[in-house]
Swiss-Prot record:
The chain crosses the membrane at residues 672-692. It holds the Pfam family GP120. It comes from Human immunodeficiency virus type 1 group M subtype B (isolate YU-2) (HIV-1). Residues 649-670 are annotated as: MPER. Residues 620-654 form a coiled coil. The keyword Lipoprotein applies. Glycans are attached at residues 87, 129, 135, 138, 154, 158, 184, 193, 230, 237, 258, 272, 285, 291, 297, 327, 351, 381, 389, 395, 400, 435, 450, 598, 603, 612, 624. This is Envelope glycoprotein gp160.
Amino acid sequence: MRATEIRKNYQHLWKGGTLLLGMLMICSAAEQLWVTVYYGVPVWKEATTTLFCASDAKAYDTEVHNVWATHACVPTDPNPQEVKLENVTENFNMWKNNMVEQMHEDIISLWDQSLKPCVKLTPLCVTLNCTDLRNATNTTSSSWETMEKGEIKNCSFNITTSIRDKVQKEYALFYNLDVVPIDNASYRLISCNTSVITQACPKVSFEPIPIHYCAPAGFAILKCNDKKFNGTGPCTNVSTVQCTHGIRPVVSTQLLLNGSLAEEEIVIRSENFTNNAKTIIVQLNESVVINCTRPNNNTRKSINIGPGRALYTTGEIIGDIRQAHCNLSKTQWENTLEQIAIKLKEQFGNNKTIIFNPSSGGDPEIVTHSFNCGGEFFYCNSTQLFTWNDTRKLNNTGRNITLPCRIKQIINMWQEVGKAMYAPPIRGQIRCSSNITGLLLTRDGGKDTNGTEIFRPGGGDMRDNWRSELYKYKVVKIEPLGVAPTKAKRRVVQREKRAVGLGALFLGFLGAAGSTMGAASITLTVQARQLLSGIVQQQNNLLRAIEAQQHLLQLTVWGIKQLQARVLAVERYLRDQQLLGIWGCSGKLICTTTVPWNTSWSNKSLNEIWDNMTWMKWEREIDNYTHIIYSLIEQSQNQQEKNEQELLALDKWASLWNWFDITKWLWYIKIFIMIVGGLIGLRIVFVVLSIVNRVRQGYSPLSFQTHLPAQRGPDRPDGIEEEGGERDRDRSGPLVDGFLAIIWVDLRSLCLFSYHRLRDLLLIVTRIVELLGRRGWGVLKYWWNLLQYWIQELKNSAVSLLNATAIAVAEGTDRVIEILQRAFRAVLHIPVRIRQGLERALL
């Protein structure tokens, strides 16, 4: 009876259970994400690559060949673009910057290349008979104008002429720094025993010309614009440029000349301030002008030292022989040292006493301030500049500081050991004006300094000179390929391409680096276009540079770098395009895939990824899994191509025109023969079956062409209902003539036979399915009713248990309350009982 009641009320329980099951399935189902490829994302990685140069075509004299070979550089961009990267923080390290090493190697190569065609002075390594030049002292001049005795030597020597077996005597003037005494009157050139001396070609100019280092296509240069950036650590004001500012390759020691200035206060930079072996680079905020001159009016003469070789030396000095010197403002310099001392105190402690002392010794290039002025190499005594403390100031009492300078013509190449250069003398007087924009300092070591820090001028490693200008730059490699999870899955359908919004074109290269991934996705076309346009522009620049120097029939260092940059850019672009092609994403900025996103790569939600993260942060998070994702995309694309190939193999039936291809006629003939053979065999089988059937009925076959009675069904016997009645008229099958007629009859019989058998089979299957369905539905209803019955029983049992528990609890509660009431009444009656007892006692 109860089971019947449950069966009647199962409908609303069924609906409720279905709804609950659906809600559970929706809540438990995790949304599937798929890998999507993006091309042109604003992502970069630190890299080292070959940089090429750009220079202003009007910055040098076309009549002379500057040693920097800037004629081989591409022209500078008249409108350079610098794009500020919002919300981007990047780490810089000026002490581990490959741009510095690359510039250093370039300068070495340029000097070597400029000296290759020049004359080797090996024949000049002979004994020199030298005497001091007359009028080498001038008592009427001031102390700094008086040239020291023996500063210029008049030397005679025997030299081979254009005829090798003929020797003649020649004389020349040499500076004292360029000769070494052998005995009292005999000398030799200073570097003959250690180096190969090469004379600089007559028309080579050492005048520094600004060089812009540029990144090839596919790379970018990041620039730190923090005004107080110390060279290492994070920088929050970052922009991207294609080329650096113009850097003058000034070769100098102690003082940095004609560089860039700090925008606000003086900035001091060092790799490690606590290590006194590390150089301190000081960048000034105001330049100090230094004017240098060689007052001597020199003449230059040529000495033939062999076939096709000439030595250029100083012939004579017209007028008084005076000391070369440099002048700078004492007030400006003292103010500069005071500001530097303040910054050094901030770094090393305000309780420290800052002292500047001259160099402690070493090579002339280190002890003095060495630089090139108008083609001559000056070595100026900087003692007056670096004799300073808070109380003593400078010893010089005049308005200007005058530095006495000496000149050398044989220069030890600061780049390499075993090479020296002879700088030919310059005619006439020499004057040059430079701006002091920085200093190179070293700190004295020792533990017991008594609260004093002593700083001395340093230098010698030209990398520090380049580092003082390149500290704000770093080269990065653009990684335009990015992968991220989305809800979209690749479908093998064809859709029209949509045009990218024009608004993206107004954003600069990498301009969306600080934006979220969702916002940056609309600027993909900018990066994609500039990668290719940069390569094309690089190609045009290269061809222009080669055309400009084609008369030389050789490439300079810069020309080789142009080729390297071009090849590198093409290789990177082709590699990216190859990956896109392998993934089936050619020509697409956003490409969906069939690779499911694995939460082990990143378990962040879509909102966290696309609304809160930049592409740079996202790339750092999945960087370890990038190769795995790439391989999975490639495998997925390979599988898809195999599937498409199998599908296309079936597509040959789509075109009826292919059926008439002459190459398939033999196949058609083969099929026709098989069909005819099958029909003939089928005809034979039917004839045999007909004969067997007739024989079983008692007839004998007379002829295959005889009319045979048609078979009747079981519901139509041969006679009438009464016995002995007349037979019904027999039906006979038609006798046909001709091969095609026989084929038609056989095909018709075969089709009818197949139709009847298939119909019977279908009816049987339908009956079976119907029977199974009924029984299955009955079983399901039975189990459902049974489940509802037991659920109701469990519910009733639970209700009964709850009721019994409630009754037991209620009864127990009543008993407890009754006991408490009795106890309370007993307590209340105690005074009454006491009173009654007292009354009884009194009575």
